[in-house]
């Protein structure tokens, strides 16, 4: 066996049809095959294609070059089929070997170590005359293989079959796949007359494996199965009889690819191959900057935006940009106030499905995260971490402009709108804009007159939940705001701030009722028109006791 027996060559057009994974697989297999042949002493010179591959050059050959694809002779077994037997190079004898096949068709297979290698056995439709057997040109079979088999996934255990520049004839399709492909796709290959999966056509005998074939005097690199066949069944699902019907079946969402590990079903075999990596743990796509690996190229593309800082998805309303389109969709719900995820038990609505899932744990009693200091329980570990900062006083999120610190990143994000002046939440009725969505929600209650927050003790209703919370302290007697210097407690935070001025000595000016209410001030001014206004000056404070104190609410 010489290196040319397993070598594959491409024209520039054919090389351009391969994706990155296929090219890498081709380089690796070709170099491994040459190393194997050289180790056996069967190769004395370094072929040009090997030199090109070692230099990192593109190994395609000019169109029209008579290249040896494989030392194979094609012989007719019966009037209805063609088969392969290894003998010699027939690349120049193709028109004579296949008189009913258009010139220019090249068929090649390069094997992958450890796999039951695929066959390129050309079979005509039984009973069809050469004139009726049309093989339209213009589209590479690579396209159809990617459509049906999901080739190009980078799986090293799948044999890569290349046929160009022809596409499958009308009513004829690629029916059988390699044993490895069937194992990956979760099904056993269906062969005519129920022959064994790895059967090799040998006159008078059928072998169940490559080892049996080699023991019988055959060669270990024989190929199996048939490629051009009459329409049959694909992976257990009823297969359409034409390519048009096949396309309709794909668009109709017919699921026929099942994972043998978890029984999940897919419409496309390429989706199944991607899914199988979740079971095998394979991550063939590696980031060149940080070395992190991914199972899909799309995940690698998204990850690389972290290094480049690229944010291609911009919000048309506020201009904020995101790395992922899904993040933009979630963000746009802020502007539309859309809350399409509603709890079936309490009716509470959420803008994100993940928030609804966490909320449902409340009804199910699922609050697994408990605070070690106060015992309060939470649905999420992140909520517990945020809560613990109320005990420790930690504020790790600092504003770079003014130095204000916050315990939560979302609070810092909202605070930064004070500096930017951004008000992305606009009222659709009056056009007034707000910096926070909660402010917009409260504002819209003015238009509707709704007071959704009702006290269970006295029945009084409020437009704001915070006002209801403060009101509830009247019934409970709770005073959570405690002065750190004297220990006096208050129901509301503003009352505590007023009280703390006693200790700091800060002077306050008592404001009249007219100063608090502009309408009352205007009425007072009208009634005293023409009379000298009586000026009231604040009485100098003789001590802390003279400072006015607000009454407790």
Swiss-Prot record:
Residue segments, region Disordered:
186-221, 502-553
Q: Where in the cell is it found?
A: Nucleus
Where on this chain is Nuclear localization signal (motif)?
Answer: 130-135
Principal place of residence: nucleus
| A biological-process GO annotation | G1/S transition of mitotic cell cycle
What terms describe the molecular function in GO for this protein?
DNA-binding transcription factor activity, RNA polymerase II-specific; RNA polymerase II cis-regulatory region sequence-specific DNA binding; zinc ion binding
InterPro entries in alphabetical order: KRAB (IPR001909), KRAB_dom_sf (IPR036051), Znf_C2H2_sf (IPR036236), Znf_C2H2_type (IPR013087)
Q: Does the keyword Metal-binding apply?
A: yes
Report whether Metal-binding shows up as a keyword of the record. Answer: yes
Q: Which Gene3D superfamilies match?
A: 6.10.140.140, Classic Zinc Finger
Q: Which of UniProt's keywords are assigned here?
A: DNA-binding, Metal-binding, Nucleus, Repeat, Transcription, Transcription regulation, Zinc, Zinc-finger
From the record, give the transmembrane residue ranges: none
State the conditions that upregulate or repress this gene: Induced at the early stage of T cell activation. Regulated at the transcriptional level during the cell cycle. Induced at a maximum level in the S phase.
Residue intervals of every C2H2-type zinc finger in the record: 257-279, 285-307, 313-335, 341-363, 369-391, 397-419, 425-447, 453-475, 481-503
Query: Which residues does the UniProt record annotate as the domain KRAB?
Result: 1-72
Could you say which tissues express the protein in this record?
Expressed at high levels in the spleen, thymus, and PBMC, at low levels in the prostate, ovary, small intestine, colon (mucosal lining), placenta, lung, and pancreas, and very weakly expressed in the liver and kidney.
Pfam short name (any one) = zf-C2H2
One GO cellular component term, please give it. nucleus
Member of which family?
A: Belongs to the krueppel C2H2-type zinc-finger protein family.
Instruction: Report the function annotation for this chain.
Output: May be involved in transcriptional regulation. May be involved in regulation of cell proliferation.
Name the UniProt record assigns to this protein: Zinc finger protein 324A
Species of origin: Homo sapiens (Human)
Higher taxonomy:
Eukaryota, Metazoa, Chordata, Craniata, Vertebrata
């Amino acid at each position: 066996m010489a290196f040319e027996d397993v070598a594959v060559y491409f024209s520039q057009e054919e090389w351009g049809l391969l994706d990155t994974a296929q090219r890498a697989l081709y380089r690796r297999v070709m170099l491994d095959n040459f190393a194997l042949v050289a180790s056996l002493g069967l190769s004395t010179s370094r072929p040009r294609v090997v030199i090109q591959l070692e230099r990192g050059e593109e190994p395609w050959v000019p169109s029209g070059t008579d290249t040896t694809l494989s030392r194979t002779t094609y012989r007719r077994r019966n009037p209805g089929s063609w088969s392969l037997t290894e003998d010699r190079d027939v690349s120049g004898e193709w028109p004579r070997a296949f008189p009913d096949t258009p010139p220019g068709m090249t068929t090649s297979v390069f094997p992958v170590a450890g796999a039951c290698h695929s066959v390129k056995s050309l079979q005509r439709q039984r009973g069809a005359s050469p004139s009726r057997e049309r093989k339209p040109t213009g589209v590479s079979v690579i396209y159809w293989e990617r459509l049906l088999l999901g080739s190009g996934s980078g799986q090293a255990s799948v044999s890569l079959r290349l046929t160009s520049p022809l596409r499958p004839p009308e009513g004829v399709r690629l029916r059988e796949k390699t044993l490895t492909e069937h194992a990956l796709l979760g099904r056993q290959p269906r062969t005519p007359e129920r022959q064994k999966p790895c059967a090799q056509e040998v006159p008078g005998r059928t072998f169940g494996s490559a080892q049996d074939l080699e023991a019988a005097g055959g060669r270990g690199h024989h190929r199996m199965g048939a490629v051009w066949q009459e329409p049959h069944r694909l992976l257990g699902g009823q297969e359409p009889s034409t390519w048009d019907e096949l396309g309709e079946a794909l668009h109709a969402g017919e699921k026929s690819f099942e994972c043998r590990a978890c029984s999940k079903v897919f419409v496309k075999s390429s989706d199944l191959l991607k899914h199988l990596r979740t079971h095998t743990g394979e991550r063939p796509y590696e980031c060149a900057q940080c070395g992190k690996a991914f199972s899909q190229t799309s995940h690698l593309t998204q990850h690389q935006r972290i290094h480049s800082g690229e944010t291609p998805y911009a919000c048309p309303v506020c201009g904020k940009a995101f790395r992922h389109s899904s993040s933009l969709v979630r963000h746009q719900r802020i502007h539309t106030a859309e809350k399409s995820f509603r709890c079936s038990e309490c009716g509470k609505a959420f803008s994100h499905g993940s928030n609804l899932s966490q909320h449902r744990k409340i009804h199910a009693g699922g609050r697994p995260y408990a605070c070690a200091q106060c015992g309060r329980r939470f649905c999420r570990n992140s909520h517990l971490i945020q809560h613990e900062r109320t005990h420790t006083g930690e504020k790790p999120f600092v504003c770079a402009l003014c130095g204000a610190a916050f315990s939560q990143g979302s609070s810092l994000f909202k605070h930064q709108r004070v500096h930017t002046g951004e008000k992305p939440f606009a009222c659709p009725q009056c056009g007034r804009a707000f910096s926070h969505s909660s402010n917009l929600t409260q504002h819209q209650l003015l238009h509707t007159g709704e007071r959704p927050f009702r006290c269970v003790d006295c029945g009084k209703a409020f437009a704001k939940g915070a006002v209801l919370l403060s009101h509830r302290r009247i019934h409970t007697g709770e005073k959570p705001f405690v002065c750190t210097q004297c220990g006096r407690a208050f129901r509301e935070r503003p009352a505590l701030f007023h009280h703390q001025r006693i200790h700091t000595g800060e002077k306050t000016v008592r404001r009249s009722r007219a100063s608090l209410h502009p309408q009352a001030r205007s009425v007072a001014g009208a009634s005293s028109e023409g009379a000298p206004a009586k000026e009231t000056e604040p009485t100098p404070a003789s001590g802390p006791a003279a400072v006015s104190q607000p009454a407790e609410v």
